[in-house]
């Protein structure tokens, strides 16, 4: 039988006769790519046993043919964001203090991008930099990313942040003990969730950054209005071209 899996906000299993019929099935999976909520939603009612792979076979193949150009991260100016990253960090620290929590492990890269006012070119047509961030209530910050993507200029801007190569994330998290650590089940993988849970108390909460970044400041609002004008002009030009050239050979 063919198995088709759609992963995302509306994750679902489209064809599953093989999994439904018969005895317990063992499925190998990469625990760094799935969160607990998604697996429960997809397979919760099926007789399955998931076996985490030590190494993702696709990653091994990809490394053999990995000759891509390293594209640097870059920062956005305050004239664009309306707020520097230190003020944003203080808001997250306040969230931790008010709930008497020690740490938050931010695993949604788009939220790391917003918090630190940084962007990247890791994925085509997306400015999101692949990264994680660990922030504690005492103002210690650890950015996990490909360190080759951080140039001297950006490193200077983020001088208050410890930048650690993303391949060291596992070893670093193992050292954290006896803390109350916030994770978002929608974005934190099973691998990291289990790793943190070994020596700490897991607090499952929605990443507070989703709410924080939804509240726009005056500069963001004004920039959105200005961009809307450029966007409207571009659409108008396209519609004009389409009407003028519809049916022609162009």
Locate predicted features:
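A composition/biophysics-driven feature that prefers long, compositionally simple stretches
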Residues: 1-249
């Amino acid at each position: 039988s063919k198995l088709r899996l759609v992963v995302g906000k509306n994750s679902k299993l489209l064809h599953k006769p093989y999994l439904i019929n018969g005895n317990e099935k063992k499925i190998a999976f990469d625990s760094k790519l799935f969160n607990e909520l998604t697996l429960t939603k997809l397979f919760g009612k099926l007789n399955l046993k998931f076996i985490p792979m030590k190494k993702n076979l696709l990653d091994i193949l990809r490394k053999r043919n990995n000759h891509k150009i390293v594209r640097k991260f870059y920062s956005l100016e305050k004239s664009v964001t309306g707020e520097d990253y230190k003020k944003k960090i203080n808001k997250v620290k306040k969230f931790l203090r008010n709930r008497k929590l020690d740490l938050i492990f931010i695993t949604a890269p788009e939220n790391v991008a917003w918090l630190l006012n940084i962007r990247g070119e890791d994925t085509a047509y997306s400015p999101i930099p692949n990264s994680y961030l660990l922030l504690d209530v005492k103002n210690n910050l650890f950015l996990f990313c490909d360190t080759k993507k951080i140039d001297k200029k950006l490193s200077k801007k983020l001088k208050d942040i410890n930048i650690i190569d993303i391949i060291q994330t596992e070893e670093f998290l193992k050292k954290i003990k006896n803390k109350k650590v916030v994770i978002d089940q929608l974005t934190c993988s099973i691998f990291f969730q289990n790793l943190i849970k070994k020596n700490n108390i897991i607090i499952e909460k929605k990443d507070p950054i989703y709410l924080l970044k939804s509240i726009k400041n005056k500069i963001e609002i004004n920039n959105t209005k200005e961009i809307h004008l450029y966007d409207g002009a571009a659409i108008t030009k396209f519609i004009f071209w389409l009407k003028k050239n519809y049916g022609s050979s162009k």
